[in-house]
Amino acid sequence: MIEIRFHGMGGQGAVMGALILAEAAFSEGKYAQKIPMYGGARRGGDVTVFLRLDDKPIRRTSGIYEPDAVIVMDPTLKKQPFVRAGLKEGGTAILNDEAEPKEVDLGVELGRVATIDATGLSTEVFGQRAIPIVNTPMLGAISKATSWIKLESLSEPIKHQLPGRLGELNIKACQRGYEAVRVTEG
């Protein structure tokens, strides 16, 4: 089982991103479970989403406190202790950050670090927004940086959740994220 914890701010699409990733996993014959957690302040407040992926049914229904991977959707969150809390040694971190992966220090020995300027990509694809839509560029980055989900498996769930022109723009953002991510092993 792969246990993933998303960290973002309300409005960035962490919950939707985890849902799309879960649907893509399901389309590949895997099992998926998504559990969002957020406070009363939605837009702009901290959002955490727990996502499990497995080849067999998932029975565990708790939060994820020792993740195999963290997905950090807002660059301001990378220094927060709750982001690295419980992250397994040798785990994966995928961050919305302009820094090179080798410059990232979460205080735990990681097996894989990936960075992408998802905020910049969001601005290029969607235009300037008060809260940039970074979930789909991050999904592209996740696809390339890991073997969890194939890039082509993300298109249909994106179209399903975000129909029409918005879906097409998000597919473009996802593909751009796949192309732009930088990955460092060990």
Residue map of PLM features:
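Active-site cofactor/cluster-binding pocket
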Residues: 1-186
